[in-house]
């Protein structure tokens, strides 16, 4: 039912069935920022319903404004590919080395091209990107081939890519299932789809519920678990070969990113120590709040 306290009017919103199984039997879990998060009674997929009629247009505007706010784009791009970030991206790109380096690797939601730089540095000859935020897309296209439209609307040759990467993407999309179908059609046989997304079956969610930092109705409109993302990948012909999780934020409501007093600094330090201890545990389970999945095209 429409929430009269929402900042959006009813004409801005649209009711949708479950993107995984197609049923229309949602159970309301909680509300956040005027949006209802529901769980499908049939398959357990969690999603926002009703949601904005044009969620992708909303995302494009938001992330383009965010990119434009950075000002010096060269400086921002350097920040996105330096120090620990660079090491992490190089390590990730190296994981795909068993695939054909002379082939093609696609990063959907490539931003300022940090991962594309890592892939090129590891020897990939044809790193490519997709980015819907014009400011970021125009910047990265100076260095790599970048298309500025939704993946499903792009006409690639079938079986074009060896690896397709989706980092913090599918939770924003109107239909993650449609994107997975397009990814399957654009991967070579044995090609790899790599997805990173928030994990709704995490210890962070258990402790924080709707206060969890990744919940915000107009932005993250799908929330997956290891179970539901595996089901959706399987429904689109993929075989899941690995699932991992990491990370935890236990007190997002009170965590101060820029402390202004000794007490706040002390509180932050204690929180970070607790989170590091718990992260050691959740990395060995599937309870981390960051979910990463590797799936192969059969």
Segments predicted by a language model, with ranges:
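Conserved N-terminal segment of class I S-adenosyl-L-methionine
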Residues: 1-167, 177-180, 245-246, 257-261, ...
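S-adenosyl-L-methionine-dependent methyltransferase catalytic module, highlighting the catalytic core
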Residues: 166, 174-182, 192-298
């Amino acid at each position: 039912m429409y929430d009269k306290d929402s900042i959006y009017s009813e004409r801005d919103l649209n009711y949708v069935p479950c993107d995984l199984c197609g049923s229309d039997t949602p159970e309301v879990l909680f509300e956040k920022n005027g949006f209802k998060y529901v769980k499908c009674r049939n398959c357990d997929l969690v999603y926002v319903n009703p949601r904005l009629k044009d969620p992708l247009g909303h995302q494009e505007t938001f992330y383009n404004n965010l990119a434009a706010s950075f000002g010096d784009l060269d400086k921002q791009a350097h920040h996105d590919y330096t120090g620990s970030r660079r090491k992490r991206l190089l390590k990730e790109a190296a994981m795909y080395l068993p695939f054909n380096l002379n082939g093609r690797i696609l990063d959907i939601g490539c931003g300022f091209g940090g991962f594309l730089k890592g892939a090129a540095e590891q020897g990939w000859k044809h790193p490519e990107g997709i980015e819907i935020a014009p400011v970021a897309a125009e910047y990265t296209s100076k260095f790599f081939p970048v298309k500025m439209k939704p993946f499903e609307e792009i006409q690639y040759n079938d079986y074009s890519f060896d690896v397709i990467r989706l980092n913090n993407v599918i939770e924003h999309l109107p239909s993650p299932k449609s994107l997975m179908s397009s990814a399957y059609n654009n991967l070579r046989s044995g090609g790899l789809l790599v997805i990173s997304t928030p994990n709704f079956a995490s210890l962070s969610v258990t402790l924080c519920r709707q206060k969890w930092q990744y919940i915000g109705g107009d932005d993250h409109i799908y929330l997956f678990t290891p179970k539901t993302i595996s089901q959706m990948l399987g429904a689109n012909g993929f075989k899941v070969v690995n699932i991992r999780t990491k990370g935890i934020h236990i007190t997002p409501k009170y965590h101060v990113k820029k402390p202004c007093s000794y007490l706040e600094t002390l509180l932050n330090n204690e929180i970070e120590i607790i989170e590091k201890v718990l992260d050691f545990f959740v990395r060995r389970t599937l309870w981390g709040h960051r979910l990463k999945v590797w799936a192969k095209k059969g």
